[in-house]
Amino acid sequence: MELLPHEKQVVEYEKTIAEFKEKNKENSLLSSSEIQKLDKRLDRLKEKIYSDLTPWERVQICRHPSRPRTVNYIEGMCEEFVELCGDRTFRDDPAVVGGFAKIQGQRFMLIGQEKGCDTKSRMHRNFGMLCPEGFRKALRLAKMAEKFGLPIIFLVDTPGAFPGLTAEERGQGWAIATNLFELARLATPIIVIVIGEGCSGGALGMAIGDVVAMLEHSYYSVISPEGCASILWKDPKKNSDAAAMLKMHGEDLKGFAIVDAVIKEPIGGAHHNPAATYRSVQEYVLQEWLKLKDLPVEELLEKRYQKFRTIGLYETSSESDSEA
């Protein structure tokens, strides 16, 4: 597994403890209580390091090559999954994976953005950057879910919509705008979870829902830290400053009422214990579905509308308040 800079100290300590334990089998250098003390010290070290991460270090965790992706969540959470392909207009976009899913006996339409796991699959998936047909495919499946009365799960993980000329020629902006318009009035529960990167319109085009949650080390932002640094300071090396200023992680966004919940990850990030992460996401999905499933459609849509309508609302005191 690829090591991030802040993980090196932990890995070195783990190696040292493993060597002690191996030698201890032959020579009994340490008692069992002393070994337990070493393990506890390791746990404390992990807690100290991972509770004091900078925003940029959390971005690095979010981008870790071994971080679980949409296809991994499908394998880890679903008892059944039937993939559906194509936008019925141009072609299938491999950057979107979607289909009928069964989780704990309940049927959903699960639609996620997929980056790929190695060079070949990343090229095939276009690194998770959706073309217009990807957004149209997602909307087609969402409308199918509405038709069959299925709740929808959106898994967001993209560095942004594909900015290429061909995508623009095929109506990239139009496709994203259409998704925002249509998903806002779709008459079925929608649960959105940002599992990795959630960048710009590429994320927003699949992030309109009744509840929006984020994994602890995922991020959701109008732009990547590197992009922000290039624009503001003309220096992409200021990415750590940009990551801090963008307030792109769950605790900040929850405070701004942009997301509703932050799902805890295992210590070190989702890639350290994918199975535990799948369980946490599955529990959250089922818990939220139980809250949404019996709401009248009119109430569901009104709450969804108001949720997004009030994002970014800025209020000033009235003249009477200031005089008082």
Swiss-Prot record:
Which InterPro entries is this protein grouped with? Acetyl_CoA_COase_a_su (IPR001095), ClpP/crotonase-like_dom_sf (IPR029045), COA_CT_C (IPR011763)
* CoA carboxyltransferase C-terminal domain span: 37-291
Pathway per its UniProt entry is:
Lipid metabolism; malonyl-CoA biosynthesis; malonyl-CoA from acetyl-CoA: step 1/1
Q: Which GO terms of the molecular function aspect are on file?
A: acetyl-CoA carboxylase activity; ATP binding; carboxyl- or carbamoyltransferase activity
Record carries keyword Nucleotide-binding: yes
- EC number per UniProt: 2.1.3.15
Q: What is its main location?
A: cytoplasm
Instruction: Please give the catalytic activity noted in the UniProt record.
Output: N(6)-carboxybiotinyl-L-lysyl-[protein] + acetyl-CoA = N(6)-biotinyl-L-lysyl-[protein] + malonyl-CoA
The family annotation for this protein states: Belongs to the AccA family.
Q: Which HAMAP family match?
A: AcetylCoA_CT_alpha
- What is the role of this chain? Component of the acetyl coenzyme A carboxylase (ACC) complex. First, biotin carboxylase catalyzes the carboxylation of biotin on its carrier protein (BCCP) and then the CO(2) group is transferred by the carboxyltransferase to acetyl-CoA to form malonyl-CoA.
Assembly, per entry:
Acetyl-CoA carboxylase is a heterohexamer composed of biotin carboxyl carrier protein (AccB), biotin carboxylase (AccC) and two subunits each of ACCase subunit alpha (AccA) and ACCase subunit beta (AccD).
Q: What is this protein called?
A: Acetyl-coenzyme A carboxylase carboxyl transferase subunit alpha
Report the source organism.
Answer: Chlamydia trachomatis serovar D (strain ATCC VR-885 / DSM 19411 / UW-3/Cx)
